[in-house]
A protein has these predicted regions:
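Loop/turn residues immediately N-terminal
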Residues: 94-101, 152-153, 408, 415-418, ...
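Surface-exposed interaction regions enriched in Ser/Thr/Asp/Glu
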Residues: 260-268, 322-324, 330-337, 366-369, ...
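Beta-sheet repeat architectures centered on beta-propellers
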Residues: 8-26, 30, 36-55, 79-81, ...
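Conserved beta-strand element within WD40/beta-propeller blades
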Residues: 87-92, 147, 410-411, 464-467, ...
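Trp- and S/T/G-rich repeat-edge/linker motifs of beta-rich repeat architectures
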Residues: 43-68, 106-130, 157-162, 282, ...
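N-terminal beta-propeller domains
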Residues: 1-107, 290, 294-401, 405-454, ...
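Long, charge-dense tracts
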Residues: 135-137, 144, 150, 157, ...
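Structural signature of eukaryotic scaffold interfaces centered on beta-propeller domains
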Residues: 67-83, 130-141, 383-405, 446-461, ...
Length: 937
């Protein structure tokens, strides 16, 4: 047997579910609370700082949210500037008064994380009637946040009441002597005829005298007199009729429908013309008219080329003015703002207004954005969120998502994409029904034989990538500028994806997920790399190496392009699953899967630059609490907490870390009570650390840490430190909870090629020892489990009422406890909770007693509690120099771990639950290797 040694240069390969002999060097079985960094190695994730317990008080205080208050909330993040970084949520409810938006500022004001004031517009809470988080979409556009209720059918705003055949304009086009001008007005079955005969000549004494010349006023005055007296026969005034002279015309109105005819002059009768609601040409209209008078200009060759015009008087009453294009009289004004997306507008620091989106609420109340100002249902249609059927009725659709691209705001509705005018974000109607411009709105549909309800969209250099449950599309323009004339939609790929979880982009890549089953299956993750215009994208199942690693309970996907990772989580679990890459510009040098276990069920995760914000829920029922936390993803902390003698600064690697709210000394029991600014979480293990450079009896206290006892008194919950009076340095006492850095290594095989891809799994290999290179700290442990060894075990029987079970054995690490019910492993946090001192298992639901169901006798639930026995190995650290009383941090250390077992006889974990950082950089193993006398070629 030959003595051999091999080195694993790094552990940046992440988790792999492949068999150990197929794993690449650097891949591991599991990496919990690890964070791969190309510079520092496989580091321990940063600790989460406690910011606030979420309450309903404004700006602070109030009642804590508990039970399931925020379980179905839609969470979002708003980054305005350095003073305004908000985390908010939408709590939908069918009862208007209970629907609400809550927003908290993550930038403290004098140490207080304030809740923003939300001012609601009239009836705006009615829009928040959807109950589930996936029923809402949120988009940030500058200083406003657009909120979309995906279940709200869009309606239209009806036009003002308008009756045709109620107006007529009689226009004198030529003044003739010795001529008859006649007007016939037919109301019901009665025709009223009014005539005026012009004089034969003038009585002027010379050519310069125009006093008695015949003009249009003479004709119009004569006709008007006749009309007002009921016609030539003078029967009396016609009820409901008015007649007004304006310029060279008479305008007649009546409260009932009527028809009108006119003729005048000696040849052809064209010296007097009449029009009511439409004309053939705009030249037929009077140059002076009543303000807002509307007439249709009819194109006899194409109805789509007809348009409407409205008179705009200079004095806004009547007289001289111009004819401008307008909307069909009585036509719908636009989309109802009450049923369209609303906006949350930032009005000041910690102040928002939730309102409808109306550009002209004075003239067009209730109309979303800009009203439809011109055209009709043929020449200027509504966007695709409302569909007009052949019988003229409207079918309401729902807006699934709002997006912003190329200076336009757009909507996704079923298989349609609607985009606003360029530069006019909420104007979805054309400026003119007569002509189309490149700035006009865009409305396109995806053509597919599959159901293609769009629910996601991402911009790329090649165009807009559209996502449906079964197919992906691209919306683009060959010349690069989207316009109604050039925009196209083409199919890209045919991958199934989860319609409730939006895709994300990570720099130049796009990621989306699909599920094999909504509960019992697992989650697949795909990566898409868009190519040039018209080219098929590259799509890769990036989660194949960890197949069935990510549960189907995932409810959200987020990304950090800055840090090149995506993160997935579900509200019923405390884990966040990550996929991180690192590229040198040509290829990905790192493709790494790992997960973080947070101190509560994860309801929200968002990364802003190098800061991660999270909302977690701890406890259940009335003791449940929602907490806002943050973590710094870099090795350089934002605040100075722990400092070594060399000036190295690190944040404590503990969750819920925060300064103790107060510190008091109990002289009777000789201990310090460090009070918590939050309720103690009994399911987590407490820890205290001292910050700064304070001294105690001449010894540097910075970096002092202890696992304290916990207690409560009239002041509140506290952690106690025995035999120390910490009141003099209360400002440096940080409280929090431990979390475990836990990396499970695969079996070691002798690798026969330089790249380490070929393993000799048939050989006999005995691993003598492993030498680990550990960075950033000197606090790390190693746990080993030998094959065939079991720990302490106890069994119990359910009685239908008892939830609490207390084994008689003890355990060093309660994470080693395994609980089974009827042979099935239970999930900690979901099915049960665990506490120490004494060891206690508390089920969420009491295990059932023996019972009879459908005449079948069923046995009582069998409970098995046992220790998954891991032995802590006593490693030896190579000799080194250190400064006495300094913080126990070292940039590089080597640990030698004795093994002396066959490679398939044990499992080894690298473990650390201390509040200090740690990084696994590399490992070399030594052992004896026998190729079983085979000659290999």
């Amino acid at each position: 047997m030959a003595s051999v040694t091999q080195t694993i240069p790094n552990f940046l390969g992440g988790v792999s579910n492949q068999p150990d002999d197929k794993k690449l060097p650097g891949q591991v079985k599991e990496a919990i609370n690890a964070y791969p960094d190309p510079t520092f190695g496989l580091t321990k994730r940063p600790g989460f700082k406690y910011l606030a317990e979420l309450k309903d008080g404004v700006p602070s205080g109030g009642t804590s949210f508990d039970n399931n208050d925020l379980d179905n909330a839609k969470w979002f993040y708003i980054n305005r500037d350095d003073d305004e970084k908000y985390v908010g949520c939408i709590v939908g409810n069918a009862t208007e008064a209970d629907a609400a938006i809550h927003v908290w500022n993550t930038v403290p004001d004098s140490g207080v994380y304030k809740k923003a004031t939300i001012t609601y517009g009239t009836n705006t809470r009615q829009y928040l009637n959807a109950l589930n988080s996936h029923n809402y979409d949120v988009l940030n556009v500058r200083d406003q946040t657009i909120i979309t209720n995906k279940t709200k059918p869009v309606t239209v705003v009806a036009g003002d009441a308008y009756n045709l055949k109620r107006n007529a304009t009689f226009l004198v086009t030529l003044v003739e002597y010795s001529a008859k001008y006649q007007i016939d007005i037919k109301i019901g079955g009665t025709t009223y005829t009014s005539t005026y005969d012009t004089k034969a000549g003038d009585t002027a004494t010379n050519d310069n005298d125009t006093t008695n010349f015949l003009d249009a006023d003479d004709i119009l005055d004569g006709l008007r007199t006749k009309i007002l007296q009921g016609g030539d026969s003078n029967p009396g005034a016609i009820s409901g009729l008015t007649c007004t002279k304006i310029g060279n015309s008479l305008e007649v109105t009546h409260t009932a429908d009527f028809t009108a005819q006119a003729k005048g002059g000696r040849t052809g009768g064209t010296s007097l013309k009449v029009y009511q609601d439409e004309v053939q040409s705009i030249t037929e209209l009077s140059g002076e008219s009543s303000h807002n008078g509307t007439v249709k200009i009819v194109n006899t060759f194409s109805a789509a080329a007809s348009y409407y015009t409205k008179f705009k008087a200079e004095n806004e009453a009547s007289g001289a003015g111009i004819w401008i294009e307008t909307r069909e009289p009585g036509g719908e004004k636009g989309l109802s703002s009450a049923t369209m997306p609303h906006r949350l507008r930032n009005t000041a620091i910690n102040a928002f207004t939730f309102e409808v989106i109306e550009d002209d609420s004075t003239n067009y109340p209730g109309v979303f954005g800009t009203a439809r100002l011109v055209g009709d249902n043929k020449t200027n249609e509504h966007p695709s969120c409302v569909v007009r059927e052949t019988d003229g009725s409207i079918t309401s659709k729902t807006v699934q998502q709002v997006f912003y691209y190329n200076n336009r705001v757009g909507f996704l509705t079923e298989d349609n994409v609607s985009m606003s005018q360029s530069g006019d974000y909420f104007n979805f109607y054309a400026e003119s029904a007569q002509t189309s411009t490149a700035a006009d709105p865009i409305d396109l549909s995806c053509s597919s034989i599959k159901e293609a309800t769009l629910h996601g969209i991402l911009p790329t250099a090649a165009g807009l990538i559209l996502f449906s449950q079964n197919q992906q599309f691209i919306m683009y323009s060959a010349d690069g500028n989207l316009s109604p004339q050039t925009a196209l939609i083409r199919g890209l790929s045919n991958y199934q994806m989860d319609e409730k979880i939006d895709p994300v982009d990570v720099g130049t890549n796009i990621n989306f997920i699909s599920k094999t089953h909504t509960t019992a299956g697992f989650t697949r993750v795909f990566g898409m790399l868009p190519q040039g215009v018209g080219q098929i994208p590259k799509v890769v199942d990036i989660g194949r190496v960890v197949s069935e690693y990510i549960p189907a309970t995932i409810t959200a996907l987020t990304a950090s392009p800055q840090n090149s990772f995506i993160a997935m989580y579900g509200t019923s679990d405390d884990k966040v699953y990550f996929y991180r890459t690192y590229s040198d510009g040509e290829q990905d040098l790192i493709q790494c899967w790992f997960n973080w276990q947070l101190p509560g069920n994860v309801h929200f995760v968002e990364v802003d630059s190098d800061t991660m914000f999270s909302v977690v829920k701890t406890g259940t029922g009335g003791t449940a609490r929602y907490h806002l936390l943050s973590a710094t993803l870099t090795q350089t902390p934002e605040e100075t907490i722990i400092v070594t003698s060399t000036g190295q600064q690190v944040n404590p690697h503990m969750d819920f870390y925060v300064k103790a709210s107060s510190v008091s000394y109990d002289s009777t029991n000789d201990l310090s009570k460090c009070y918590l600014p939050y309720s103690d979480i009994s399911t987590l293990d407490p820890v205290i650390i001292i910050a700064g450079t304070q001294t105690f009896s001449g010894v540097t206290e910075s970096g002092f840490t202890i696992e304290p006892d916990r207690g409560t008194d009239g002041t509140g919950d506290f952690f106690s430190v025995p035999r120390k009076d910490l009141t003099g340095q209360a400002a440096n006492v940080y409280v929090g909870y431990k979390y475990s850095y836990d990396v499970t290594l695969p079996k070691m095989y002798f690798r026969r090629d330089p790249d380490g891809k070929v393993t000799d799994y048939t050989a006999a290999l005995i691993v003598s020892r492993m030498k680990f290179s550990i960075g950033q700290s000197a606090v790390v442990g190693f746990k080993l489990k030998s094959k065939g060894r079991t720990g302490s075990t106890e069994t119990f029987t359910g009685d239908g009422t008892n939830k609490v079970f207390t084994p008689t054995f003890t355990v060093e690490d309660r994470n080693d406890i395994i609980v089974k019910k009827n042979g099935a492993v239970q999930t900690k946090g979901t099915d049960y909770t665990i506490t120490n001192e004494p060891l206690t298992i508390t089920f969420t639901t009491a295990p059932l007693a023996a019972r009879t169901v459908d005449n079948e006798a069923l046995a009582a639930d069998s409970i098995e509690i046992y220790v998954d026995q891991w032995y802590t190995l006593q490693s030896t650290q190579e000799s080194n120099y250190y400064l006495g009383d300094d913080v126990p941090l070292d940039t590089q250390s080597t640990f030698v771990v004795p093994i002396h077992q066959r490679t398939d006889n044990y499992t080894l974990r690298v473990y650390s639950d201390s509040p200090f950082p740690v990084a696994l950089t590399s490992m070399a193993w030594e052992g004896t290797y026998s190729p079983r006398y085979y000659r290999r070629t």
